[in-house]
C-alpha cells in the first residue's frame, strides 16, 4: 500500500490555454498517485529553452508545462522499491506538456515523478541548485551512454583517455556533459566564447576553443591529431554542425545533437549522425508531432536505472554540481515572466530558477 499525506484535490499550475498560451490556473487537478512513482510538493523549478518552443501541435490544452523541478516527497506509490520516503528532498525531470499524462508537468504545486528516475538531494545542495539538474543530466547520459555508447561509463572509466568534443560547453547541458565526461576519464574538448573559458574549465574542460574563430574546426582537428570520433552539439545550428563535422577526424565517428539537425549538412558518410529527445527517458515514448513522435521503448527506462544509481552516488559525494543559476522568488506567477525573459534571449550563461514559498 502506498503512503501519502492528505493531498488537495486541486492545485495552482501553469497550463496551456485554449490557444496554447501559458496560463496560471488555480483549479488544476492534482495527479493521482501511480504505483511506482512519487509525488513531491514543489520547492523550486528551472526553465529550459524547450519551455519556450512548445507551440502549435506540441500543445495539449489543459496540460501542465515544465520539466525541471525539486521538492519534498509527500506521497510514495506501493511499488516504489528504491527507499524513497515521505520527507525526502528530491529532484528530477517531469513530463511537461505530455498528451498522455497532461497533469505530469513540473510547473505545479505538486509533481509526480517515476521513483527510479528521481534523485535524492544531498544535504549541501539547495532546492534551487537541484531543480536545475534534471534535463541536463538526462541529456548528457542519453547522448553519451545510450546513443553514442562511448567506451566508458560512470561506473567504469575509460582504460585510456580518448577525446570527446562538447560544442557549446557553457550551456547547462554543456557543463553537465563536461563533468560526466571527466568522471568517465575522457579528454574533454569544448567550444564557447572567450568570456566563458574559465567557466568551462572549472567544469572539467581540458581544452577550449573559440567558436567564433575561423579556424575553430581546424584547431580542434589538429589538437586531436585528426582522431576525434565523438562530438555532442548542444546548440544544433547550421554553423555548429559544420564545425563539428569538420572537427571529427579522417576515420569518421559520431555526431549527436540535442535537437533535430539539418540533414543536408550531414555531408560526410563516415560520420554517423543522430539526435536525442530527453523526454524519452521514461520509456513511454512521445506523442509530440514528427520528428519528435516515438513509440514506447521500455529498454530506455531499463538502461536509465543503473545510470541514475551512479549519478546518485556522484551527487552524494559532491562530484556533480549545477550549472550557474539565477534564482528568483515569486513562485509560479513569476515563472510566466521568466518564460518571456528566456524567449527574448535576455539570459546567458545561467539557468533561471524560481523558488516557491
Swiss-Prot record:
InterPro entries for this protein: ADH-like_C, ADH-like_N, GroES-like_sf, NAD(P)-bd_dom_sf, PKS_ER, Trans-enoyl_RdTase-like
Function: Trans-enoyl reductase; part of the gene cluster that mediates the biosynthesis of burnettramic acids, an unusual class of bolaamphiphilic pyrrolizidinediones that display potent antibacterial, antifungal, and cytotoxic activities. The first step of the biosynthesis of burnettramic acids is the hydroxylation of proline by the proline hydroxylase buaE to generate 4-hydroxyproline. The PKS-NRPS buaA and trans-enoyl reductase buaC construct the highly reduced polyketide chain, and the condensation (C) domain of buaA then catalyzes the amide bond formation with the activated 4-hydroxyproline.
Binding sites annotated in the UniProt record for substrate: 135-142, 278-282
UniProt name for this protein: Trans-enoyl reductase buaC
Residues annotated for NADP(+) binding in this entry: 50-53, 170-173, 193-196, 211, 258-259, 347-348
Record keywords: Antibiotic biosynthesis, NADP, Nucleotide-binding, Oxidoreductase
SUPFAM superfamilies tied to this protein: GroES-like, NAD(P)-binding Rossmann-fold domains
Family in the record: Belongs to the zinc-containing alcohol dehydrogenase family.
Pathway: Mycotoxin biosynthesis
The keyword Cell division is assigned to this record: no
Protein EC: 1.-.-.-
One MF term in the entry's GO annotations: oxidoreductase activity, acting on NAD(P)H
Domain of life, source organism: Eukaryota
Subunit structure: Monomer.
GO biological process: antibiotic biosynthetic process
Species per Swiss-Prot/TrEMBL record: Petromyces alliaceus
Broadest EC class assigned to this enzyme: oxidoreductase
Amino acid at each position: 500500500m502506498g503512503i501519502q499525506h492528505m493531498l488537495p484535490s486541486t492545485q495552482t499550475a501553469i497550463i496551456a490555454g485554449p490557444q496554447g498560451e501559458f496560463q496560471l490556473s488555480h483549479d488544476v487537478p492534482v495527479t493521482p498517485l501511480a504505483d511506482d512513482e512519487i509525488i513531491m510538493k514543489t520547492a523550486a523549478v528551472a526553465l529550459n529553452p524547450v519551455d519556450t518552443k512548445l507551440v502549435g501541435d506540441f500543445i495539449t490544452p489543459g496540460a501542465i508545462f515544465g520539466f525541471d523541478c525539486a521538492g519534498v516527497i509527500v506521497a510514495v506509490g506501493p511499488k516504489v522499491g528504491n527507499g524513497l520516503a515521505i520527507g525526502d528532498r528530491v529532484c528530477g525531470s517531469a513530463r511537461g506538456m505530455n498528451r498522455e499524462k497532461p497533469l505530469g508537468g513540473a510547473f505545479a504545486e505538486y509533481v509526480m515523478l517515476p521513483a527510479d528516475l528521481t534523485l535524492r538531494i544531498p544535504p549541501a545542495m539547495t532546492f534551487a541548485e537541484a531543480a536545475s539538474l534534471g534535463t541536463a543530466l538526462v541529456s548528457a547520459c542519453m547522448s553519451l551512454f545510450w546513443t553514442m555508447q562511448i567506451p566508458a561509463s560512470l561506473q567504469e572509466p575509460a582504460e585510456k583517455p580518448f577525446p570527446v568534443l562538447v560544442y557549446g560547453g557553457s550551456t547547462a547541458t554543456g557543463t553537465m556533459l563536461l563533468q560526466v565526461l571527466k568522471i568517465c576519464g575522457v579528454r574533454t574538448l569544448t567550444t564557447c566564447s572567450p568570456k566563458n573559458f574559465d567557466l568551462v574549465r572549472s567544469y572539467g574542460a581540458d581544452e577550449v576553443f573559440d567558436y567564433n574563430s575561423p579556424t575553430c574546426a581546424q584547431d580542434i582537428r589538429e589538437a586531436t591529431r585528426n582522431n576525434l570520433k565523438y562530438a555532442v552539439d548542444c546548440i544544433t545550428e547550421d554553423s555548429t554542425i559544420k564545425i563539428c563535422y569538420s572537427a571529427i577526424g579522417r576515420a569518421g565517428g559520431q555526431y549527436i545533437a540535442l535537437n533535430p539537425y539539418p540533414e543536408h549538412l550531414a555531408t560526410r558518410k563516415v560520420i554517423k549522425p543522430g539526435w536525442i529527445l530527453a523526454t524519452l527517458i521514461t520509456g513511454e515514448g512521445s506523442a509530440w508531432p514528427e520528428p519528435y513522435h516515438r513509440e514506447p521503448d521500455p529498454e530506455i527506462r531499463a538502461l536509465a536505472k543503473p545510470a541514475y544509481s551512479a549519478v546518485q552516488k556522484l551527487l552524494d559525494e559532491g562530484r556533480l554540481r549545477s550549472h550557474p543559476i539565477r534564482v528568483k522568488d515569486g513562485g509560479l506567477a513569476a515563472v510566466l515572466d521568466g518564460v518571456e525573459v528566456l524567449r527574448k534571449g535576455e539570459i546567458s550563461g545561467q539557468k533561471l530558477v524560481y523558488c516557491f514559498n
